[in-house]
């Protein structure tokens, strides 16, 4: 926070937030980093940011938003928090040498002292460590912070250490320090105005210090932990909202604390992007509407042209059927001749001999394969048997280890029991000597007490003699009774001693039997537990053995089903992929169909009608070229629009037809005149291996290639004009060159091209394949259905995979449980047998140790007799003693002040005498029973040692057995490995034999094929077959001339091939010929514009392109708009949630501090808190509501403190430093604030500088600051401790 006279640091932390120090940790004026997201302060930077468009994707923008900051600490009881233990100042400001300030209390510490003594230097020292600039510590530069006085001059540096630790609060002032949580942060300033930071003695940068303190909850960003002198009332006086981008009001202050301020910048970015996308979308929408209007205008002519092409296609189909019918009839005749040839079969002796040899070789190889398979099966069986042996040995190993574990545990228990028995032996041996010492010591003490009793009785008698006149009668009666009581006392003591001795003898006599009964009870309980465990595990094994086969069977079925489903999924995915490619190819084919103009359309119509045969079509439509060369060939080849015909005569007929119909003019290429170019079409050597355009053209009919050479000649294509220039002007020859951009260099040297538009689209990139739009729609529907089915299969597969995983897990768990329970059954059986034996032994021991009934009865009768005797004597003595006490009490009441003290001494001595008598009796009983107990303990030692030897032998035997099992297992593993090593060689031999067998089979098949070929080579039928084949060839040629027109976006339809059944159904081919004539007549009557199809298609493609662009930008706009709305809602929700918590706590705090006032944070605009900001309104007690600016100094202070404590409730900070926050408060309010700090904020450490006694008197720790000889010193006291000792 700033010093006096400045704006409050909580309201202006952006301006005061210091930049980080240099990377090496040394700087001339280091200070904290400003909070993230608020680093740009100059206006120019803000303007630049607003002008530049953020082109990041929506995902990148959303991912760049940091998450809400986690709380560094909580208000929960028992939660750890940070506290300052003490501060060490070394030559800092007024502190010379090393001065320790503290220790500070975990809750409430007050710093007091006279003005000018250096109180504020305590906070300056903390600001110095926390990285504030020298100006913020009331100094011009860092070197001024070094102490300088008459006694201490020329000091080169000053250092401040702030020591921290993390604690967990307990009741009262107590707390628990979290282990290894202590650390300290120090900063050293030197004379050259540089400073360095250390954390626990290690040199660090300020960034490291800041991260460490922030991680422990110290709010360096908002400085809420620091309120300096004179600024407390200004915290609540912030404006509702900052007036500029870099100003901060109450709204921005709360936003940063709540954490929703991180969303402000992304919201601005998304808002700007939505505005820009709306503008772009409007442009795209206008383009769509324009293209749609143009497309609709062409639809009528397009439909007429399609009808014409459909009729022509029907003519071609019927011609195709007639030709196929003739081919089918000829093929039937050829098939009949082939049947005759097959009947003629020559015996081939050589082939049969070879076949017999191969058959014998196959038998031999089959025998070798069977022998090898026997070896392979034998080794495999051996490996499996060894694996089963290893599994059995592994189970035995588990059982032996369980037994060994039990025996080892038993040995340890016996060792402990032996140690205890030996200790008892030593104890019983020492009992007689100890008891005699006790008797001697007690007797000596008893004698001394008797003497002391006589003295005290004499003193009592003397006192009573002095009071004889007043109590003479009572005294005589009391003396008489006391004499009588003394006679009874000796009898009571003797009777009690006899009774105690008799009772001890009875207890000792019965102790061994009672111990045996206790051991038997424990053993029976262990036996019951072992039996129940064994029963449960056997039941579990039966249950698992029943469920495991079912689970395995279900798992196998599900795995097979999953495998089948996986294969089905793969097939469907492949099918969908192939179908998708076909659909895309069909759509592309429809989009690439070109229309023809009126002239070309009319010429093609004549061709279809048969009136002018020999017409091929437009040259550009008869070939294809890569899209890369589209501009080049469209620019340099004007002949692409020429019409190709068979001969010049046909070309002349076409010219005459155009003249008669007055349709227009056209240029024709006659193929009969193109043969002269055949020799020049071969590949040639070109400069720089530049490609020749002619070589790049693809054609369906090779006759057309001559026409393309006529049109292109040796024109070369270059990447750019520079290359074209180099290639065109060669020394020995000039070339005609065209660039990819359409620029042409002629052989004469002239150059053409350039301009704003280029020519393209006169030749397609692929040969046209006709397909209908209906077929495309069917393919798309099929693709959609197959995709849905693939998705369903995928979902079924996921569910099945989950079921298989669960079944595998269940199977594995059952197998492990079965193996573990099976291995433990034997151990439990042995344990049950052992416990049965132990119970029997203990039952025998109980019987053996059973006391003699007569002796027990005799001892019990002795105890009863002595007790009766004691009760009778005690009753008589009790009556006398009661009478003595009555008389004594009567006398005491009369002479209470004079006799009470003396009587108390006498009573105390009597009590000690009774204790001595009891001790002597117990010691005598112990001496009598020591020998008997010693013998029992020694017997127990011998039994335990024998059991230990037996157990050790059992451990050795089990260890040897375990070693033997391990050796057997190692041998089994060795044999298995040896067998597995030999397995690959035999497998390889087996594979080689199978391969040889396969070769023999292939040779045999080849021999059979040769035999069949020889049989078919009969010359007597070849002449007839050749004649029919010649006719078939003719009709095939006629079919090859037929091609269907591509119509709209339908897939290009291939000429259909009729099945034999369809061809058999044709009875009269002449009727089809008549139908063809009728269709041709209809076509001749129509006058369509075939170019309308291409024009309509172009407009439709453009329309779909524009619609796709519009959909794309609409989707993008909607995505950004939705993200914008979501972020605004998230920001509002986060802010209002924190706002309600803070304002409710503020109201509660203010009411408590003012004893009846009211305060709240109000939304200036209730619909949008971010538009006008937050207003702080206050109603002091017994006053009306007022704005914060209209309050007195004390009222502002209370309001600010209420807000500070409300923010602490919402976002706790472990430390608070406050400098004279009570300066503007009266006596009453100071007490209220002090009491509130003491009682309500128990989860934070408050260090307050105060001169008000009703503030610092209530604190838990006082830090006194005073100055002598220009040096500040300190002393820490605990006011409550001083008050409890009565020192103040």
Curated annotation (Swiss-Prot):
Its primary localisation, in coarse terms, equals nucleus
- Comp. bias intervals (Polar residues): 1-10
- Please list which residues make up the signal peptide: none
Q: Name one Pfam family in it.
A: SMC_N
Q: Please give the residue positions where the record annotates the modification N6-acetyllysine.
A: 381, 679
Q: Which residues form a coiled coil?
A: 272-588, 767-1020, 1109-1129
Q: Which residues get modified to Phosphoserine?
A: 22, 28, 41, 50, 143, 982, 1056
Q: Which GO terms describe its cellular component?
A: chromosome, centromeric region; condensed nuclear chromosome; condensin complex; cytosol; nuclear speck; nucleoplasm; nucleus
The record, for InterPro entries, names:
P-loop_NTPase, RecF/RecN/SMC_N, SMC, SMC_hinge, SMC_hinge_sf
Q: In which tissues is it expressed?
A: Widely expressed. Higher expression in testis, colon, thymus.
Q: Name the residues that bind ATP.
A: 113-120
- Record-annotated SMC hinge domain positions: 613-727
Question: What is known about what this protein does?
Answer: Central component of the condensin complex, a complex required for conversion of interphase chromatin into mitotic-like condense chromosomes. The condensin complex probably introduces positive supercoils into relaxed DNA in the presence of type I topoisomerases and converts nicked DNA into positive knotted forms in the presence of type II topoisomerases.
- Subunit (UniProt): Forms a heterodimer with SMC2. Component of the condensin complex, which contains the SMC2 and SMC4 heterodimer, and three non SMC subunits that probably regulate the complex: BRRN1/CAPH, CNAP1/CAPD2 and CAPG.
Task: Please state what the protein is called.
Answer: Structural maintenance of chromosomes protein 4
């Amino acid at each position: 926070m700033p010093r006096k006279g400045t704006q409050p640091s909580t309201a202006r932390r952006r301006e005061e937030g210091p930049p980080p120090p240099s990377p090496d940790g040394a700087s001339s004026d280091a200070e904290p980093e400003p909070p993230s997201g608020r680093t740009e302060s100059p206006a120019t930077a803000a303007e630049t940011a607003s002008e530049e468009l953020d082109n990041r994707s929506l995902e990148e923008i959303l991912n760049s938003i940091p998450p809400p900051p986690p709380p560094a600490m909580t208000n929960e009881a028992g939660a750890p928090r940070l506290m300052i233990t003490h501060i060490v100042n070394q030559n800092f400001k007024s502190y010379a040498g090393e001065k320790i300030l503290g220790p500070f209390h975990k809750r409430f510490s007050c710093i007091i002292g006279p003005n000018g003594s250096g109180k504020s230097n305590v906070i300056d020292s903390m600001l110095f460590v926390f990285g504030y600039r020298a100006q913020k510590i009331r100094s011009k530069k860092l070197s001024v912070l070094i102490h300088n006085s008459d006694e201490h001059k020329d000091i080169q540096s000053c250092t401040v250490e702030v020591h921290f630790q993390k604690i967990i609060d307990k009741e009262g002032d107590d707390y628990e320090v979290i282990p290894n949580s202590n650390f300290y942060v120090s900063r050293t300033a030197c004379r050259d105005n540089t400073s360095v930071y250390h954390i626990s003695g290690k040199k660090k940068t300020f960034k490291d210090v800041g991260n460490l303190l922030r991680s422990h909850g110290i709010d360096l960003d908002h400085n809420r932990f620091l309120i300096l002198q004179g600024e407390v009332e200004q915290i609540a006086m912030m404006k509702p909202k900052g007036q500029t981008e870099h100003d901060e009001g109450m709204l921005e202050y709360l936003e940063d604390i709540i954490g929703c301020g991180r969303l402000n910048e992304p919201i601005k970015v998304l808002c700007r992007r939505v505005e820009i996308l709306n503008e772009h979308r409007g442009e795209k929408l206008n383009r769509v509407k324009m293209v749609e209007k143009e497309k609709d205008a062409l639809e009528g002519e397009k439909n007429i042209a399609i009808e014409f092409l459909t009729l022509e296609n029907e003519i071609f189909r019927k011609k195709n059927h007639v030709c196929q019918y003739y081919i089918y009839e000829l093929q039937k005749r050829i098939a009949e001749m082939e049947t005759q040839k097959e009947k003629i079969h020559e015996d081939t002796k050589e082939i049969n001999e070879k076949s017999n040899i191969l058959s014998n070789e196959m038998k031999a190889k089959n025998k070798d394969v069977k022998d090898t398979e026997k070896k392979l099966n034998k080794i495999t069986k051996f490996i499996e048997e060894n694996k089963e042996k290893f599994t059995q040995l592994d189970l035995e190993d588990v059982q032996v280890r369980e037994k060994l574990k039990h025996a080892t545990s038993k040995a340890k228990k016996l060792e402990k029991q032996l140690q205890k028995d030996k200790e008892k032996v030593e104890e019983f041996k020492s009992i007689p000597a100890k008891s005699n010492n006790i008797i001697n010591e007690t007797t000596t003490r008893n004698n001394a007490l008797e003497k002391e009793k006589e003295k005290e009785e004499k003193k009592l008698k003397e006192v009573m003699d002095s009071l004889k006149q007043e109590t003479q009668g009572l005294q005589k009666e009391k003396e008489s009774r006391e004499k009588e009581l003394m006679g009874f006392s000796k009898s009571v003591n003797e009777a009690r001693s006899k009774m105690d001795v008799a009772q001890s003898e009875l207890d000792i006599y019965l102790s061994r039997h009672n111990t045996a009964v206790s051991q038997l009870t424990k053993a029976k309980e262990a036996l019951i537990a072992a039996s129940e465990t064994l029963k449960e595990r056997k039941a579990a094994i039966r249950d698992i053995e029943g469920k495991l086969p079912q689970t395995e069977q279900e798992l196998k079925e599900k795995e097979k089903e999953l495998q089948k489903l996986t294969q089905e999924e793969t097939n469907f995915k492949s099918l969908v992929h192939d179908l998708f490619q076909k659909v895309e190819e069909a759509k592309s084919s429809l989009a690439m169909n070109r229309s023809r103009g009126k002239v070309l359309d009319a010429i093609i119509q004549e061709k279809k009608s048969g009136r002018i045969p020999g017409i091929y079509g437009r040259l550009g439509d008869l070939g294809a070229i890569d899209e890369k060369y589209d501009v080049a060939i469209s620019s340099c080849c004007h002949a692409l629009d020429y019409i190709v015909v068979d001969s010049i005569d046909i070309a002349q007929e076409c010219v005459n037809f155009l003249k008669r119909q007055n349709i227009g003019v056209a240029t024709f290429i006659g193929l009969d005149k193109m043969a002269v170019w055949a020799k020049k079409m071969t590949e040639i050597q070109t400069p720089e291996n530049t490609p020749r355009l002619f070589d790049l053209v693809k054609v369906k009919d090779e006759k057309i290639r001559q026409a393309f050479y006529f049109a292109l000649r040796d024109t070369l294509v270059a990447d750019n004009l520079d290359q074209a220039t180099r290639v065109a002007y060669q020394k020995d020859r000039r070339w005609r060159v065209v660039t990819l951009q359409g620029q042409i260099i002629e052989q004469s040297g002239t150059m053409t091209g350039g301009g704003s538009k280029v020519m393209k689209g006169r030749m397609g990139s692929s040969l046209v394949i006709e397909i209908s739009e209906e077929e495309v729609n069917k393919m798309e529907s099929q693709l959609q259905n197959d995709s849905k089915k693939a998705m369903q299969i995928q979902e079924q597969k996921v569910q099945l995979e989950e079921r298989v995983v669960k079944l595998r897990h269940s199977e594995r768990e059952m197998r492990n449980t079965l193996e573990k329970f099976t291995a433990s059954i034997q151990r439990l059986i042995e344990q049950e047998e052992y416990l049965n034996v132990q119970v029997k032994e203990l039952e025998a021991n109980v019987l053996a140790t059973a006391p003699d009934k007569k002796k027990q009865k005799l001892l019990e009768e002795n105890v009863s007799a002595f007790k009766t005797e004691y009760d009778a004597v005690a009753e008589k003595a009790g009556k006398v003693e009661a009478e003595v006490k009555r008389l004594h009490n009567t006398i005491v009441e009369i002479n209470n002040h004079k006799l009470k003290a003396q009587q108390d001494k006498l009573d105390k001595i009597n009590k000690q005498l009774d204790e001595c008598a009891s001790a002597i009796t117990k010691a005598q009983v112990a001496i009598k029973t020591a020998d008997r107990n010693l013998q029992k303990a020694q017997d127990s030692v011998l039994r335990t040692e024998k059991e230990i030897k037996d157990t050790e032998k059992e451990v050795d035997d089990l260890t040897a057995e375990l070693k033997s099992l391990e050796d057997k297992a190692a041998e089994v593993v060795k044999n298995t490995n040896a067998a597995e090593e030999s397995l690959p060689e035999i497998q390889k031999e087996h594979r080689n034999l199978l391969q040889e067998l396969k070769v023999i089979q292939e040779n045999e098949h080849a021999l059979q094929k040769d035999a069949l070929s020889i049989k078919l080579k009969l010359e007597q039928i070849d002449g007839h077959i050749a004649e029919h084949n010649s006719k078939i060839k003719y009709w095939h040629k006629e079919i090859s001339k037929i091609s269907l027109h591509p119509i709209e976006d339908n897939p290009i339809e291939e000429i259909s091939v009729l099945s034999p059944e369809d061809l058999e159904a044709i009875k009269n081919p002449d009727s089809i010929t008549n139908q063809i004539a009728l269709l041709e007549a209809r076509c001749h009557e129509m006058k369509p514009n075939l170019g309308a199809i291409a024009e309509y298609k172009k407009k439709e493609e453009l329309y779909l392109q524009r619609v796709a662009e519009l959909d794309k930008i609409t989707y993008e706009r909607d995505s950004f708009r939705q993200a914008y709305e979501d972020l605004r809602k998230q920001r509002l929700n986060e802010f209002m949630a924190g706002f309600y918590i803070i304002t409710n706590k503020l109201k509660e705090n203010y009411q408590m501090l003012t004893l009846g006032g009211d305060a709240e944070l109000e939304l200036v605009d209730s619909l949008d808190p971010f538009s006008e900001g937050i207003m702080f309104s206050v109603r002091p007690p017994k006053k009306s509501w007022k704005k914060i600016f209209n309050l007195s100094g004390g009222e502002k202070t209370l309001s600010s403190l209420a807000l500070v404590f409300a923010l602490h409730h919402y976002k706790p900070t472990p430390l608070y430093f406050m400098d004279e926050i009570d300066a503007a408060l009266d006596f009453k309010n100071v007490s209220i604030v002090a009491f509130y700090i003491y009682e309500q904020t128990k989860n934070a450490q408050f260090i307050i500088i105060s001169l008000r006694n009703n503030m610092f008197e209530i604190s838990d720790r006082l830090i006194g600051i005073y100055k002598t000889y220009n040096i500040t010193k300190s002393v820490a006291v605990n006011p409550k401790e001083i008050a409890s000792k009565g020192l103040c």
